[in-house]
Structures are given as C-alpha cells and as structure tokens.
C-alpha cells in the first residue's frame, strides 16, 4: 500500500485469485483492489509482487487523495519507479479519457458513427461496432467502438451526459453536454504511455 499512500488497516482483506496469476488474497477499499500474497513458485520463491486494479471511481478517489497532497498520477508512477526499479513493474491496462463539455460538442457520437460507416478513419484495426440503448421516449444513448477491446489500442466514443443522467436520475439540462472519448491501452502501449506521462504530466492537464 506504499504506492497508494494508504494505511493497510482500512482495507477489507479476503481470499481471492486471478486467472493465470498466483495471488491468493485481495485487499479492497471501495473500487480499489490490490491482489497479493502470491504463492511461492520456482520463478518467485519469496512470493513477492502485487496486482493493483482501480475502476473509474477508484481512480477518482486516488486522484482526490493525490491532489490533496499536491501530487499527480505522474508522481505516483515516479514513486513506482523509485521503489521497484524501472524493470520490476508494468502496466497491463490504462484507460485515457478526453472529455468534451462544450455546449456545442466538437463532434457527436452520431457523427463518429457516420465516419466509421464511410470508413473515414485510420486505425490499427478496421473493426468497429456500435451500441445503442434507450435513453427516453425520443432519444437513445450511443457508443462507438473502434478496434477490439483486447487489442493494444482501442477507442470508445459515447454520450457521457446520458450515462450520468441514467445513473444519477438527472436531466440533460442539469448535466449539460458531455461527450467522452476513451483510449484503452494494454500492456506495452499502456506502460509506454504511463512512463511518458510520468515525465510529461502536462499532457493530461487539459483533462484535469
């Protein structure tokens, strides 16, 4: 818990495993999960290591804690490097969000959908698909996906305003226009971005 800067005794601890991993226990507080107590193996005779997972809410919680200390996620990544060394930790997934809260959005999800249908985009994968769900009697909430979710880089574009309305029983007037672009990075791409952000935190300042 040194990286998070949180005391161990505030976590709930229970037995849990992860597929293809040797962890035997999980520490949880809210939407922050740390798997550890690795089973000793020939490759890991001391049973060292842990696996940190934070959902979107978990990231929001850690952001507030870091911000209260005048720190950023970049500082947290630097702490990882100082504590474990450059080659002894890695990111398996990192989701980057870009929010457009302009009254007139830079683009709508419907416009992105039409671009995909006309194949007016460049990506490592030609795959794309759409999801649409009922929002009210006259409208739907839309999501566009480009590339497979398991690929090294994939994109999601969706109506964040309608998602917030549905989750928190608010109106669009209360929430305001809010379109979100998410880049989902995995493995080498996730780690490379985190290390770039560590050294150049200004690349995320507009979002913050």
Predicted regions and their residues:
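Structured, helix-rich domain cores that form ligand/interaction pockets
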Residues: 1-207
């Amino acid at each position: 818990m040194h990286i998070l800067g949180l005391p161990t005794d505030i976590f709930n601890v229970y037995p849990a495993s992860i597929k293809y991993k040797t962890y035997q226990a999980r520490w949880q507080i809210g939407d922050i999960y740390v798997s550890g107590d690795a089973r000793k193996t020939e490759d890991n005779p001391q049973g060292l290591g842990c696996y940190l997972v934070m959902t979107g809410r978990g990231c929001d919680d850690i952001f507030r804690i870091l911000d209260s200390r005048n720190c950023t996620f970049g500082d947290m990544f630097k702490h990882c490097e100082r504590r474990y060394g450059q080659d002894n930790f890695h990111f398996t997934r990192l989701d980057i969000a870009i929010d457009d809260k302009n009254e007139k959005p830079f683009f709508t999800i419907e416009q992105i959908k039409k671009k995909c249908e006309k194949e007016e985009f460049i990506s490592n994968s030609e795959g794309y698909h759409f999801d649409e769900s009922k929002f009210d009697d006259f409208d739907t909430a839309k999501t566009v996906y480009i590339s497979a979710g398991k690929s090294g880089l994939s994109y999601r574009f969706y109506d964040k305003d309608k998602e917030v309305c549905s989750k928190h029983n608010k109106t669009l007037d209360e929430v305001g226009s809010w379109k979100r672009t998410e880049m989902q990075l995995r493995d080498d791409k996730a780690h490379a971005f985190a290390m770039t952000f560590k050294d150049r935190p200004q690349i995320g300042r507009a979002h913050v």
